[in-house]
């Protein structure tokens, strides 16, 4: 155009949303006025997006997700004259920021792993993610239908399972979980594209060490337009370790060619895992040679940051229920005082469950006053169901805010949770929404205008969480401690945001010298709110940079994982036989025999404490068995089935071989029988160790 008279209109979020709806949704209502600032612009230029040479790295977490990329000079040359270059860091890691719409659009590097349904139009689903999803939930009324999903990462193990989606107008649709995960990840990629003004052809998405092949397969299927760095994809434990290795090289704090050993405890939002690593750094003429051997040592799929939040929620619910008419409920202060003992020794003697038995019993009784088990109300009225569901999410979110406030800032001694502003000495007031909590009065569920004020202090909170945290540390560390193996480790790295809590370090000192733990925590890390969450992402980006630019030749070897589960079955004499042993890399397969007439086998999954967690039913159809030579069976299962064990099968004997499968984090059952002297092989069946039938899910409506 010859006439260059341009104006840039700047407006707040409300006006922007209004204008967007007018343009996109054909609204019949046109406002009389719009408030905005007009800025004259001499000229503008529309540029195509750059093509990034570096992969976008994503740390897909149970509670929060982060993303980032390494930007070199070549990238900045393509952005010549773009104001974004004044914000981005040259030859450094750059993170994807997100707007926290609940806190005045403040920039944050953390995106909650949350998805909410905005609307369903002719089967088309519109989502909101992260902070926006949380904001919409907070804006909803108690009796409104709302659909929000947490803990998306846990869905990877059962990604084809259908979820029912409902919008506020009552429209319903079923969609597979993989589609929700895909939409969430595409949103993260879109935020990165917007930030860095470039398209990404390749991605690196870190995965848990125990389920890495499963994650890679799913990401390939749901993100087919991107090249997945599957060959160079680090699991979360190795990514954390590589960040440490990179810091050692940068600070010249390593001895050339020396073998180091490290333990990594990753306490995420939903699970906690223990990995071991051995690594050696050699400075060669053209690049560093880094050899890493890693192995999965232990894990607890039932423990993570959400467990600690749930403990705070238990205390909060009990405190509120007591003030709402539950006079027969025990005083929360008395329950907390009962924890003011040598709780570590109590856990050693009686276990974690025994320590919390009184609190769990009181919490169950509080359900009569302040209901949160919304699954029990699926056949009640719509209003009651959503009121109880809202109670759970409202209290759980308050508990999360309380936990974060105490452990991200060290100057809070006492906190009041109230829907009305309070000013008290040495007390921080956590303001919560009004008209959000419902309680049972005279058999009816009533909505409260304001919640009763609840108080909690840092001393009580530490007492409350000590047993849970020591229990998980003891589960991981006691075995190596008793075998005198801990002295071999020079580094112990704590990662995950929950590890900001000093109780982790206190519990570790029961087994490990504090100096080793200190060496794995960067000085001043307590001042960096998200540093522990970013360690995994930083390690992945540094690894990608070193590999892409040829700074390091990295060789990664994965040893056989140690399974934290036991698989057993009963013989015909009712004797229990262990088929897969826990934490024993040598005994990860076994077999048990039945008579040919009995083609059904029950298998029992137990945890490290010997508690039965799940029962598998394995049935065989004799019509599907085919004749096979023993050497062919041995070859088909890569030697996991020995020919001697096949030769031992007598006529009319059905032998079930149970083979651990690390790549899919489960086990395969292979039925073989001998009939009229001929071996016959039945179809094998795969079972996952971790299924929704027993894994704790805090958002399933049973808490």
Q: Which stretches of residues belong to each language-model region?
A:
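Metal-dependent DNA phosphodiester-chemistry modules and their immediately adjacent helices/loops
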Residues: 263-277, 549-552
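Phosphate-binding loop and its immediate beta->loop->alpha context
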Residues: 1-13, 89-203, 207, 217, ...
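Acidic, glycine/GT-rich loop-and beta-edge segments that sit at the periphery of enzyme/chaperone cores
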Residues: 1-27, 324-346, 518-647, 651
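Short beta-strand scaffold segments in enzyme catalytic cores
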Residues: 65-69, 113-117, 272-277
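Helical "lid/coupling" subdomains associated with nucleotide-phosphate turnover
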Residues: 181-184, 309-314, 318, 357-554, ...
């Amino acid at each position: 155009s010859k006439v260059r008279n341009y104006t840039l209109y700047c407006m707040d979020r409300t006006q922007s949303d209004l204008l967007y709806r007018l343009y996109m949704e054909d609204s019949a209502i046109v406002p009389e006025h719009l408030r905005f600032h007009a800025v004259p612009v001499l000229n503008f230029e529309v540029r195509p997006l750059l093509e990034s040479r570096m992969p976008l790295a994503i740390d897909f977490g149970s509670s929060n997700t982060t993303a980032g990329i390494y930007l070199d000079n070549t990238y900045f040359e393509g952005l010549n004259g773009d104001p974004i270059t004044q914000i981005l860091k040259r030859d450094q890691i750059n993170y994807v920021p997100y707007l926290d719409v609940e806190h005045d659009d403040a920039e944050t590097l953390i995106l909650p792993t949350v998805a909410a349904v905005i609307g369903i139009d002719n089967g088309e689903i519109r989502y909101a993610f992260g902070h926006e999803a949380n904001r919409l939930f907070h804006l909803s009324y108690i009796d409104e239908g709302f659909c929000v999903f947490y803990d998306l990462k846990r869905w990877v193990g059962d990604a084809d399972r259908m979820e029912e989606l409902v919008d506020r107008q009552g429209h319903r649709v079923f969609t597979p979980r993989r589609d929700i995960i895909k939409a969430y990840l595409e949103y993260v990629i879109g935020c990165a594209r917007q930030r860095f003004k470039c398209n990404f052809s390749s991605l690196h998405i870190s995965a848990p060490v125990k389920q890495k092949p499963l994650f890679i397969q799913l990401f390939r299927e749901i993100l087919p337009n991107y090249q997945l760095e599957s060959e160079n994809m680090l699991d979360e434990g190795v990514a954390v370790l590589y960040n440490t290795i990179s810091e050692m090289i940068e600070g010249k704090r390593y001895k050339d060619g020396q073998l180091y050993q490290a333990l990594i405890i990753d306490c995420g939002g939903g699970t906690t895992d223990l990995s071991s690593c051995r690594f050696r750094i050699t400075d060669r003429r053209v690049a560093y040679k880094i050899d890493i051997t890693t192995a999965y040592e232990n894990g607890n799929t039932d423990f993570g940051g959400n467990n600690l939040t749930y403990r705070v929620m238990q205390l909060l619910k009990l405190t509120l229920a007591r003030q709402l008419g539950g006079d027969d409920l025990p005083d929360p202060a008395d329950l907390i005082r009962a924890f003011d003992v040598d709780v570590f020794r109590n856990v050693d003697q009686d276990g974690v469950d025994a320590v919390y038995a009184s609190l769990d019993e009181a919490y169950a009784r509080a359900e009569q006053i302040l209901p949160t088990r919304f699954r029990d109300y699926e056949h009640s009225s719509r209003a009651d169901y959503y009121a109880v569901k809202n109670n759970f999410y409202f209290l759980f979110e308050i508990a999360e805010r309380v936990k974060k406030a105490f452990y991200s800032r060290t100057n809070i001694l006492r906190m009041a949770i109230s829907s009305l502003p309070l000013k008290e000495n040495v007390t921080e007031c956590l303001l919560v929404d009004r008209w959000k909590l419902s309680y049972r009065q005279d058999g009816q569920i009533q909505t409260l205008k304001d919640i009763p004020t609840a108080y909690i202090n840092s001393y009580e909170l530490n007492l409350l969480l000590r047993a849970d945290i020591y229990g998980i540390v003891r589960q991981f560390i006691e075995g190596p401690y008793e075998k005198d193996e801990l002295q071999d480790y020079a580094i112990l790295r704590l990662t995950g945001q929950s590890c900001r809590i000093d109780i982790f370090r206190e519990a570790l000192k029961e087994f490990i010298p504090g100096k080793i733990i200190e060496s794995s925590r960067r000085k001043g890390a307590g001042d960096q709110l998200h540093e522990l969450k970013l360690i995994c992402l930083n390690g992945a980006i540094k690894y990608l940079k070193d590999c892409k630019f040829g700074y390091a030749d990295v060789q990664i070897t994965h040893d056989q994982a140690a399974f934290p589960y036991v698989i057993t079955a009963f013989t015909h004499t009712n004797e229990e036989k262990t088929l897969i042993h826990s934490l024993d890399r040598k005994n990860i397969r076994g077999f048990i025999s039945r008579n040919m007439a009995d083609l059904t086998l029950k298998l029992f999954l137990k945890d490290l404490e010997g508690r039965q967690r799940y029962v598998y039913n394995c049935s065989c159809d004799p019509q599907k068995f085919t004749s096979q030579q023993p050497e062919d069976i041995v070859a088909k299962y890569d030697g996991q089935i020995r020919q001697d064990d096949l030769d031992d099968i007598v006529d009319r004997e059905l032998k079930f071989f149970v083979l651990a499968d690390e790549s899919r984090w489960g086990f395969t059952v292979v039925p073989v029988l001998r009939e009229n002297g001929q071996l016959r092989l039945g179809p094998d069946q795969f079972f996952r160790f971790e299924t929704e039938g027993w894994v704790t899910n805090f958002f399933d409506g049973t808490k």
